[in-house]
């Protein structure tokens, strides 16, 4: 199975249900007044961090995800039901981008952290909502607000808590299979592992994911070999195991083998070499390994402690693992404390009372003269209210005209050269201009 760490999806939130015009019709109540209910809110789409997810594989074939629409309002002041929101569980370390602008919409790092990415539309108001002391029998209603429609790219930047890095055939696959349930393919050739292999262990009721990440070669930071596909996966690991083979058949120059990995990390991103890195020398049971170990120790000049193991025979693997996990818990505690200080657990956009996303609509308009007596007009404010106010009742026509007056619509058309009788198209409607 291919490892999926990036995918593109279209998210379509639900539209709000329409409000209605209705009247109270009861015996002995000659002037019952309005009784039209509001429409329900459309369903929104959320991404939720889930530590049980490890890949975006389950989204591979989901090109479009839709939320349901809110229900229409009903008679007797009955409101339409709100549609249920859609919650999509994704692995921790998932970053959500706007596919068009490349803007980061969500960076998900905490278990059960929720992000609203596509907001459902507000339900339209029924005529009861518009009743006032000045208008006791309003023939006013609204259509539901359109739900958001957005194409997003999901990229998994954190696939594991602990990453195992090293040159091809350092023994990473053998190591991870020695203490986890991972079953990687092993063989003596370059890039045996073409996708990250994940293995899991449990300590103190905590699940810890290890990743055998495909081997680095010189020039990986420029994209050579598996290049960036490898490096991006170690950016957010809590710590790294730098595995190096002591077998002279793998590395005739042990210092060069060590420095290749260190230099590639530095060239890609300096912060990588500042991570906790545990240097583990593997294949100590091979002929010539002790000589290579001594050369490596002299090169490092006691600046870095080396843990010596044989992954194949399981020599010293458990002791090495205990030390690594202790460092992991220390790093995780520091990381979680920083998140609590700087990030809210939930980032929730509140429903607005009358406009989408609780923001002020841009009232700027653009007027295009198509010919001598035909104009098209565009603008966020116009687009929103053209959809919300159906021009099917006299009261709605008056309300829509009030919206136009609030932005000096007629004055701007006159300045653009419009005269009485000209046709004015505003998105889906066409009006006759009156000075």
UniProtKB/Swiss-Prot annotation:
Residue ranges constituting the Obg domain according to the UniProt record: 1-159
Keywords: Cytoplasm, GTP-binding, Hydrolase, Magnesium, Metal-binding, Nucleotide-binding
Residues holding Mg(2+): 173, 193
This enzyme's EC code(s): 3.6.5.-
GO MF term set: GTP binding; GTPase activity; magnesium ion binding
Record GO biological process: ribosome biogenesis
GO terms for cellular component: cytoplasm
Listed InterPro entries: G_OBG, GTP-bd, GTP-bd_Obg/CgtA, GTP-bd_prot_GTP1/OBG_C_sf, GTP1-OBG_CS, GTP1_OBG_dom, GTP1_OBG_dom_sf, OBG_GTPase
Assembly, per entry: Monomer.
UniProt cross-references to PANTHER family, sorted A to Z: DEVELOPMENTALLY REGULATED GTP-BINDING PROTEIN-RELATED (PTHR11702), MITOCHONDRIAL RIBOSOME-ASSOCIATED GTPASE 2 (PTHR11702:SF31)
Family (UniProt): Belongs to the TRAFAC class OBG-HflX-like GTPase superfamily. OBG GTPase family.
Function: An essential GTPase which binds GTP, GDP and possibly (p)ppGpp with moderate affinity, with high nucleotide exchange rates and a fairly low GTP hydrolysis rate. Plays a role in control of the cell cycle, stress response, ribosome biogenesis and in those bacteria that undergo differentiation, in morphogenesis control.
Protein name: GTPase Obg
Organism: Ureaplasma urealyticum serovar 10 (strain ATCC 33699 / Western)
Taxonomic placement: Bacteria, Bacillati, Mycoplasmatota, Mycoplasmoidales, Mycoplasmoidaceae
Protein's gene: obg
């Amino acid at each position: 199975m291919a490892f999926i760490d990036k995918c593109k999806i279209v998210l379509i939130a639900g539209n709000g249900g329409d409000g209605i015009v209705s009247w109270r019709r009861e015996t002995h109540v000659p002037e019952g007044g309005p009784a039209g209910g509001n429409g329900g809110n459309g369903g929104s789409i959320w991404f939720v961090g889930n530590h049980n997810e490890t890949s975006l594989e389950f989204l591979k074939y989901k090109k479009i995800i839709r939320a349901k629409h809110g229900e229409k309002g009903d008679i007797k002041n009955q409101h339409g039901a709100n549609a249920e929101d859609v919650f999509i569980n994704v692995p921790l370390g998932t970053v959500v981008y706007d596919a068009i602008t490349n803007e980061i919409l969500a960076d998900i790092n905490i278990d059960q952290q929720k992000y609203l990415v596509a907001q459902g539309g507000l339900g339209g108001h029924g005529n009861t909502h518009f009743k006032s002391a000045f208008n006791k029998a309003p023939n006013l209603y609204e259509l539901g607000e359109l739900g958001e429609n957005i194409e997003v790219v999901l990229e998994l930047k954190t696939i594991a808590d602990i990453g195992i890095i090293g040159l091809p055939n350092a023994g990473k696959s053998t190591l991870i299979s020695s203490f986890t349930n991972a079953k990687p393919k092993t063989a003596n050739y370059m890039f045996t592992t073409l996708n990250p292999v994940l293995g899991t262990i449990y300590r103190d009721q905590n699940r810890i994911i290890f990743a055998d990440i495909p081997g680095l070669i010189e020039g990986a930071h420029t994209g050579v070999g598996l290049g960036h596909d490898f490096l991006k996966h170690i950016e957010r690991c809590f710590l790294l195991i730098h595995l190096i083979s002591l077998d002279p058949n793998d590395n005739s120059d042990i210092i060069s083998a060590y420095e290749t990995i260190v230099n590639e990390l530095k060239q890609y991103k300096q912060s990588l070499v500042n991570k906790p890195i545990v240097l583990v020398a593997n294949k100590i049971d091979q002929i010539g390994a002790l000589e290579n170990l001594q050369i490596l120790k002299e090169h490092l000049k006691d600046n870095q402690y080396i843990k010596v193991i044989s992954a194949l025979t399981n020599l010293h693997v458990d002791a090495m693992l205990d030390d690594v996990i202790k460092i992991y818990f220390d790093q995780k505690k520091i990381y979680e404390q920083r998140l609590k200080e700087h990030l809210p657990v939930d980032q929730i956009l509140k429903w607005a009372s009358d406009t989408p996303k609780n923001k002020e609509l841009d009232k700027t308009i653009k007027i295009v003269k198509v010919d001598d007596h035909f104009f098209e007009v565009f603008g966020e404010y116009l687009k929103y209210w053209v959809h919300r106010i159906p021009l099917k009742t006299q009261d709605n026509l008056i309300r829509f005209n009030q919206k136009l007056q609030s932005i000096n619509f007629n004055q701007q058309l006159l300045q653009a050269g419009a005269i009485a009788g000209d046709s004015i198209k505003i998105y889906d409607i066409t009006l006759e201009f009156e000075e």
